[in-house]
Regions:
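Terminal transmembrane helical anchor/hairpin motif
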Residues: 161-205
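Short helix-capping/hinge motifs at transmembrane helix termini and TM-loop junctions
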Residues: 14-23, 101-106, 135-139, 161-165, ...
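Small-residue-enriched core segments of transmembrane alpha-helices in multipass membrane transport
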Residues: 8, 34-43, 113-128, 148-155
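Hydrophobic alpha-helical transmembrane segments of multi-pass membrane transport proteins
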Residues: 6-15, 30-101, 154
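Hydrophobic alpha-helical transmembrane segments
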Residues: 1-30, 232
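Alpha-helical transmembrane segments of multi-pass membrane transporters/translocases
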Residues: 11, 15-16, 187-232
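Alpha-helical transmembrane segments and their short interhelical loops
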Residues: 72-147, 205-223
């Protein structure tokens, strides 16, 4: 997840400095396109949960919790829930930044609530990925350094630019990136520009694709993180 100040910087840098050079599919305001993509970036960032899990293991917090009479899934579940609450604050700040630069949710309150719910669900699922990797890495410093590897996942997507202008091989990767599906779903539900007229299945059916990715991440990483916590 981005830090609380990062959305402001990204909106300024990409929205005002680079925005005039980027065209949106079907026309429309680039800043509206960008803000919806940044919502997806916030939801997909696993770095805070990864670093927190590694820090807890390094400092012996995991050992202390395991000595308590609680289920082994309670601690990672609590961390995932806490990260989700922090994410709500990030979404709120992102919305305020967006409103300040002209972004609007054009399809009404119900669809906007659906968009936020989808973003929160994906973030909850992504948090489990971070928890598992943090426990696997085991050292806070190493986890912080490994966070640089997460950056390309965001860049190889449609968050900042449409994938149509990418080379064919790179576009395939970007189109099937879960972050691209989530960003496209946010744009669709918020009523923002940028929905492609043709392309890969996840971008033509972004809400369904985002729900599928969310379910897949939970199915894979909840048991992995729980077992790793029990053995940490």
């Amino acid at each position: 997840m981005l830090t609380l100040g990062a959305p402001v910087a990204l909106v300024v840098i990409f929205g005002y400095i680079f925005g005039s050079a980027i065209s949106v599919p079907g026309g429309g305001d680039y800043r509206a396109y960008l803000v919806s993509g940044l919502f997806a970036t916030i939801a997909a960032n696993i770095v805070p949960s990864m670093v927190a899990a590694a820090r807890d293991r390094t400092r012996g917090v995991v050992d202390r919790f395991r000595s308590l009479p609680i289920t082994r899934s309670a601690v990672p579940l609590g961390q995932a829930a806490a990260t989700a609450l922090y994410g709500l604050a990030s979404f709120l700040l992102m919305a305020l930044c967006g409103l300040a630069v002209g972004w609007r949710a054009g399809r009404g309150a119900a669809d906007a609530a659906a968009a936020l719910g989808l973003l929160a669900a994906f973030q909850f699922a992504a948090t489990w990925v971070g928890i598992y990797l943090g426990l696997l890495i085991g050292k806070e410093e190493t986890a912080a350094q490994a966070s640089i590897l997460v950056f390309p996942v965001t860049m190889l997507s449609n968050v900042f630019v449409p994938t149509a202008g990418m080379p064919a091989w790179l576009r395939t990767i970007a189109d099937w990136n879960p972050v691209s599906a989530l960003a496209a779903a946010a744009r669709q539900l918020f009523g923002n520009p940028g929905s492609p007229a043709n392309g890969a299945w996840p971008l033509l059916h972004p809400v369904a694709a985002s729900l599928a990715w969310t379910a897949l991440l939970l199915i894979i990483f909840v048991p992995l993180a729980t077992r790793r916590y029990a053995r940490a």
